[in-house]
UniProtKB/Swiss-Prot annotation:
Name assigned to this protein: Putative pterin-4-alpha-carbinolamine dehydratase
InterPro entries listed in its UniProt record: PCD_sf, Pterin_deHydtase
Top EC class, one word: lyase
The family this protein is said to belong to: Belongs to the pterin-4-alpha-carbinolamine dehydratase family.
GO-annotated biological processes: tetrahydrobiopterin biosynthetic process
Keyword Lyase annotated: yes
Keywords of the record: Lyase
GO MF annotation list: 4-alpha-hydroxytetrahydrobiopterin dehydratase activity
Species assigned in the record: Burkholderia cenocepacia (strain HI2424)
Entries under PANTHER family matching the protein: PTERIN-4-ALPHA-CARBINOLAMINE DEHYDRATASE
Pfam families: Pterin_4a (PF01329)
EC number: 4.2.1.96
Keyword Lyase: yes
Catalytic activity: (4aS,6R)-4a-hydroxy-L-erythro-5,6,7,8-tetrahydrobiopterin = (6R)-L-erythro-6,7-dihydrobiopterin + H2O
Amino acid sequence: MIHKLTSEERKTRLEGLPHWTAVPGRDAIQRRLRFADFNEAFGFMTRVAIKAQEMNHHPEWFNVYNRVDITLSTHDADGLTERDIELARFIDGAAAHAQPGA
């Protein structure tokens, strides 16, 4: 079974993820990104999709033109887990050239 993060674990892990915010009413985190154009946004999503498939852990996301909104939560645990934190760190690295959220 996948271990859901405790409140203290969640707080500690999120200190290292300053671009992520809590989703109101859910045990989930969200990040909004904006890229130069659709090609950059889609390229970013492709890199994340490959990693997510390797992890067997898939984000909820929404894309319009150059904007990508991502929500992470582990459905099997009904909340945040280490898998979400690992994927968030990968996303941060992949999005290093992105502009602040839209």
